């Protein structure tokens, strides 16, 4: 068997509306995902046992034990196929860890697709998406990519028409935020509030249909931003820098701490990136475009 390499994008929540906590501990969500051109590569190789190795961004923060989502994905797929999960997974990370960009979910999606090919299963994409939902809320979208509406825990996906491409700048933090901590802080901040059923705004869907960056920038929204900034007040300074240098929109990505800025074009994205780098409010900066395709097999 030859090695199989899969490239998987990061995700950005253009809008994230969080409902009340459910009995199972999750929250009902309404979100619009967009896949962006920050990628992890997952390579599956033949092996006698199931093992994983990691290189690149934030290696020391990535678990190498059974909690690694790529290993979880391998076991879910092997159980579905009725085989022993024998393979080595090598992950090359460029998506920051614990950054609100679903890097772990991307690795799980990459493992699913790479092992599907390595083990010669060639399951329908719909079956892989169903398996992905067993692993984590963001894993199905990492497979699908582009732009999509997510309901339930975020795993129930419907494609969204998005014309054109959008230019993004991401400001990363040296210290991550744990997603459960951010949700717990949101619950604390909203304690006693009556929450409506979550739904995305008509304004966001309209901005995507027409492909206008200025319209999209004005309707970016994230219910978790309040909680993330409460836990990390320094994020407010990062968001302010982007606003001051003309970003069309500024938002905490998912549960944070990464901040995302929408630019008018590539030139303005460079200006915003330079300003953020000079400000000292973040550890590093990257530019990306979206939407892009989901997990796909590439030449190693």
Where do the PLM segments sit?
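Contiguous, small/hydrophobic- and glycine-enriched helical/loop subdomains that border
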Residues: 86, 108, 112-149, 153-156
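Conserved, helical-rich catalytic subdomain that frames metal- and/or nucleotide-binding sites
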Residues: 144, 151-249, 264-270, 274-277, ...
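Short, conserved aromatic-histidine micro-motifs
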Residues: 60, 126-144, 272-290
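Glycine/serine-rich anion-binding loops at beta->alpha junctions
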Residues: 63, 90-119, 137, 247-263
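Residue-level signal for inorganic ion chemistry
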Residues: 14, 42-44, 70, 104, ...
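ATP-binding N-lobe of GHMP and related small-molecule kinases
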Residues: 1-99, 117, 121-126, 163, ...
């Amino acid at each position: 068997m030859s090695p199989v390499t899969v490239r998987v994008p990061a995700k950005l929540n253009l809008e994230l509306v969080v409902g009340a906590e459910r009995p199972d501990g999750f929250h009902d969500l309404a979100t619009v995902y967009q896949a962006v051109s920050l990628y992890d590569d997952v390579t599956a190789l033949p092996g006698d046992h199931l093992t994983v190795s990691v290189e690149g961004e934030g290696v020391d923060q990535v678990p190498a034990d059974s909690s690694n989502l790529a290993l979880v994905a391998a076991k879910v797929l092997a159980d579905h196929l009725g085989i022993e999960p024998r393979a080595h997974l090598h992950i090359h990370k460029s998506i920051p860890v614990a950054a609100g960009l679903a890097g772990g979910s991307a690795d799980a999606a990459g493992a699913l697709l790479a092992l599907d090919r390595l083990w010669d299963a060639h399951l329908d994409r719909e079956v892989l998406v169903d398996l992905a939902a067993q692993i984590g809320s963001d894993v199905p979208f990492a497979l699908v990519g582009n732009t999509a509406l997510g309901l339930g825990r975020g795993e129930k996906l419907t494609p969204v028409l998005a014309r054109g491409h959008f230019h993004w700048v991401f400001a990363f933090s040296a210290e991550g935020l744990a997603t459960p901590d951010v949700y717990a802080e949101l619950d604390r901040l909203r304690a006693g509030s009556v929450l409506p059923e979550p739904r995305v705004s008509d304004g966001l869907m309209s901005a995507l249909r027409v492909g206008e960056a200025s319209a999209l920038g004005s309707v970016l929204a994230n219910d978790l931003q309040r909680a993330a900034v409460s836990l990390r007040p320094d994020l407010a300074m990062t968001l302010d820098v982007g606003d001051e240098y003309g970003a069309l929109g500024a938002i905490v990505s998912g549960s944070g701490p990464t901040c995302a800025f929408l630019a008018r074009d590539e030139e303005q994205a460079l200006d915003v990136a330079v300003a953020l780098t000079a400000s000292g409010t973040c550890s590093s900066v990257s530019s990306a475009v979206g939407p892009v395709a989901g997990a796909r097999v590439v030449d190693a």
